[in-house]
């Protein structure tokens, strides 16, 4: 019997939370984004988007801002967090 992707994802997420790794990774990401000024930049971008398109709703603003915000994450932050995730996965997944 093989495990489907949704089940595997669910188990990984559950283990991340139970092991405390989710909180560690999340805190590292938040700290780095705050330190780099990313949060303020995204707030400014969102305000600007709201002023330009006054009739838009949350979903429309999110669809515009989210891709730009993701691009604004620095390479060093992206690599650091991805490295933490890879290390966590290597601990729990048998790749042989």
UniProtKB/Swiss-Prot annotation:
GO terms classed as biological process: chromatin organization; mRNA export from nucleus; nuclear mRNA surveillance; poly(A)+ mRNA export from nucleus; positive regulation of transcription by RNA polymerase II; post-transcriptional tethering of RNA polymerase II gene DNA at nuclear periphery; protein transport; regulation of protein localization
Keyword terms: Activator, Chromatin regulator, Cytoplasm, Isopeptide bond, mRNA transport, Nucleus, Protein transport, Transcription, Transcription regulation, Translocation, Transport, Ubl conjugation
Subcellular location: Nucleus, Nucleoplasm; Cytoplasm, P-body
A GO molecular function held by the record: transcription coactivator activity
Predominant location: nucleus
GO CC terms, sorted: DUBm complex; nuclear pore; nucleoplasm; nucleus; P-body; SAGA complex; SLIK (SAGA-like) complex; transcription export complex 2
Cross-link (Glycyl lysine isopeptide (Lys-Gly) (interchain with G-Cter in ubiquitin)): 68
Inducing or repressing factors: The gene for SUS1 bears 2 introns, and its expression is highly regulated by splicing, translation and decay. The presence of the introns thereby play a key role for SUS1 function in yeast.
Superkingdom of the organism of origin: Eukaryota
InterPro entries cross-referenced by the UniProt entry: TF_ENY2, TF_EnY2_sf
Entry function: Involved in mRNA export coupled transcription activation by association with both the TREX-2 and the SAGA complexes. SAGA acts as a general cofactor required for essentially all RNA polymerase II transcription. At the promoters, SAGA is required for transcription pre-initiation complex (PIC) recruitment.
Subunit structure of this chain's protein: Component of the 1.8 MDa SAGA (Spt-Ada-Gcn5 acetyltransferase) complex, which is composed of 19 subunits TRA1, SPT7, TAF5, NGG1/ADA3, SGF73, SPT20/ADA5, SPT8, TAF12, TAF6, HFI1/ADA1, UBP8, GCN5, ADA2, SPT3, SGF29, TAF10, TAF9, SGF11 and SUS1.
Family listed: Belongs to the ENY2 family.
Annotated PANTHER family: ENHANCER OF YELLOW 2 TRANSCRIPTION FACTOR
Name of the molecule in the record: SAGA complex subunit SUS1
